Amino acid sequence: MINPQQRKFEKGFTLIELLIVAAIIGILLAIAIPNLLKARISSNEVNARKALQTLKDAEYEYFEQDLDDNGDRNFTNLIGALGTAGTLRDPAGTSDPADALIDSTFQDAVSSDGSPSSSAVCADPKAGYCLSWSDDAGTDAQSLKGDFGWEASMTSARVNGRKDFSAFTDKVIKCTVTSQASGANGTFESGSNDRACDG
């Protein structure tokens, strides 16, 4: 049992002390949140570059091994799905996931399979980015003996990323800072004449 005289000397936190603690927490959050958002954007951009690297490597394997088995060494402008021959998901049309050059996460991350897209809208973005065939490389799959081009653009400019990326047969990932307003869909602005992305 607590002695009533002891209770007099017990104290809790004063209102001033609680306000000081709340102010310190507010200051720490004001410092931490922008840094966390920047880290998320940087992470999304790294993942977009890796996705383009994967597409680039898949295109070269498709080209070198004539994986569509048509006798021509050519590229493809299709990510496709299992069961769709001549695509990076199913080059020979075997419907076997083991034959796929890329995994299924690319299927729903493409804005418009086989043709250039003007807006980064897709069913399931890869780390906030949609993918599209580049109009710098042409649109006729049968004439793609000399070039391919893929682009990545953010689904929400300056929220999911600040840069658009592209990859072509020159084996260099290129980028440009988006011109879109914050929150707007990306528009696949990077092209074959952009500078190489160093990070």
Predicted regions and their residues:
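Extracellular/periplasmic head regions of type IV pilus-like filament subunits
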Residues: 57-161, 169-170, 196-199
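N-terminal leader/signal peptides at the extreme start of proteins
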Residues: 1-13
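Alpha-helical hydrophobic helix detector
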Residues: 19-35
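A short, surface-exposed interaction/processing loop segment used at functional sites
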Residues: 165-195
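Aliphatic-rich helix starts adjacent to a transmembrane/signal segment
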Residues: 35-52
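Secretory/exported precursors with cleavable N-terminal leaders
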Residues: 12-20
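Conserved alpha-helical elements of the SDR catalytic core
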Residues: 32, 39, 59
